Structure formats: structure tokens, C-alpha cells
Amino acid sequence: MIRNIDELSYMMLKKSLDATSARDRVIAHNIANVNTKGYKAFRVVFEEKLNGVLKGERLALKVTNEKHLNDGSGIENLSYDLKKDNSSSMRLDGNNVDIDNEMANLAANAILYNALVSQANSKIAMRRFIISEGRR
């Protein structure tokens, strides 16, 4: 259970970094299969779920034991989803990977990842400063 806003921001950063890392792997997998006959691209869905949690929507939960209770309202339960892109293809082989789109997504994801890492580093530096009471 998250107890304060600082824990919430760390958890959001962690979940966002997990999703952007997964998206990077998925995009790389799509690019690697650009010439595979019949291959359908995959997408990582995360931002919509994050926005829903921030608006107070409940998450569908997975439990390992039916006796475990959880209301699904916290960011602790948030994770990304993998979705197969079943859109049609202009190619004759049925592959729907657009290399230009994938490269643009890869660049945008790298920028987002770097921004999240910078934010996390700033939070850690601030905590380190507070712990040392401002002394160097």
C-alpha cells in the first residue's frame, strides 16, 4: 500500500520504466521480423491504463489465491499489456510491420525512457541531499 505522494511518484516511475523497456523490446522484435511472412506487429499498451488509474478507475486483477483480497484501485496493480496489431497489410506476404513507423516509435520511446531515467535520477539526488542534510 502506498503511504505518501513520494512513494506514488516512485511507483509511477518504476511502472513507466518497465513499460518503456518492454516497448523497446517489442519494437525491436517487430523490426527483426519485418521480412517474416505473415508476421503481425505487437504493441505495448500502458499509457491508457495509467491514465485510467490516475482517474480512479479500477484494474482487472490477477490473484494467485482466491483468498487474497485487493480492490484493484492502486498503481501497484498496474502493468502493461501486449496487443497484437491485426490491421491489414499493403504487402502481399501479410506482414503488417511498417519499418518507418517502427523506427519512429523506437526513437520516441528512447526519448521517453531517457526522460524517465532523468526524473528518477533527480528524485534519488534529492533524497541523497536530504539524507546528508545538505552537507557535501
Question: What name fits each language-model region?
Answer:
Residues 1-136:
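Amphipathic alpha-helical polymerization modules
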